[in-house]
């Protein structure tokens, strides 16, 4: 019983952690692209010289 529960937890961690990491990475990347795009176009905070 202990071995199977450990194996279940290990497989759950092995599958769940990369999935959550990939989802979080995808969300943060898309959100970062959006925010950087908006801040770059409206305020130009990312670039030292404003492009106009």
Swiss-Prot record:
Localization per Swiss-Prot or TrEMBL: Cellular thylakoid membrane
Annotated Pfam families: PsbM
GO cellular component: photosystem II; plasma membrane-derived thylakoid membrane
Keyword Cytoplasm: no
Ranges annotated as biased composition (Basic and acidic residues): 42-52
GO aspect biological process, one term: photosynthesis, light reaction
Keywords from the UniProt entry: Membrane, Photosynthesis, Photosystem II, Reaction center, Thylakoid, Transmembrane, Transmembrane helix
Bilayer topology term: Single-pass membrane protein
Coiled-coil annotated spans: none
Transmembrane domains' residue ranges: 6-26
Region (Disordered): 31-52
Chief localization: membrane
Function of the protein: One of the components of the core complex of photosystem II (PSII). PSII is a light-driven water:plastoquinone oxidoreductase that uses light energy to abstract electrons from H(2)O, generating O(2) and a proton gradient subsequently used for ATP formation. It consists of a core antenna complex that captures photons, and an electron transfer chain that converts photonic excitation into a charge separation. This subunit is found at the monomer-monomer interface.
HAMAP family according to UniProt: PSII_PsbM
Family, as annotated: Belongs to the PsbM family.
Assembly mode: PSII is composed of 1 copy each of membrane proteins PsbA, PsbB, PsbC, PsbD, PsbE, PsbF, PsbH, PsbI, PsbJ, PsbK, PsbL, PsbM, PsbT, PsbX, PsbY, Psb30/Ycf12, peripheral proteins PsbO, CyanoQ (PsbQ), PsbU, PsbV and a large number of cofactors. It forms dimeric complexes.
Stated name of the protein: Photosystem II reaction center protein M
Taxonomic source organism: Prochlorococcus marinus (strain NATL2A)
Gene this chain is encoded by: psbM
């Amino acid at each position: 019983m202990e071995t199977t529960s450990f194996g279940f937890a290990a497989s759950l961690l092995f599958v769940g952690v990369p999935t959550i990491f990939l989802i979080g990475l995808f969300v943060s990347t898309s959100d970062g692209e959006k925010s950087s795009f908006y801040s770059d176009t409206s305020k130009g905070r990312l670039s030292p010289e404003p492009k106009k």
